[in-house]
């Protein structure tokens, strides 16, 4: 019996589009707690992944020193998200350090038993997609530090590419409700 489902195809096609697995194959770290299609093959692609693919046309950038009041629409409907950054560089796009806020709904690919959370709410991600430069045999390569799938931490950074933001009590920043 073949246990493949739509989520498996979405996950594997994510690799075709350039995404790494977000789970730690050494099982030492769970930065997304299994709550992503590229992590535990549940739900949809998260805001960082869609931003990296160029699929987020409705993202709004907020410079960290600003004080603003914003409204978030359902991320699963239109990709609405808020990017919060200190020193944003347009030339780097997704490949820098920042936060992303989304309004999560338990619908669509996130619906039912395959959803991240049972209730609707705001989710905050910390992204560290900073690039590093490597030279080998006269060729220059750029890559993203990613400890999510590297148990040996070959880059020596101990940084996760993407992770839920945690409170001082160790809980993820997730607020159920609409306000």
Stretches with model-predicted labels:
Residues 68-179:
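Non-catalytic C-terminal accessory/binding modules of secreted extracellular proteins
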Residues 1-115, 130:
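Extracellular hydrolytic enzyme modules, especially secreted metalloproteases
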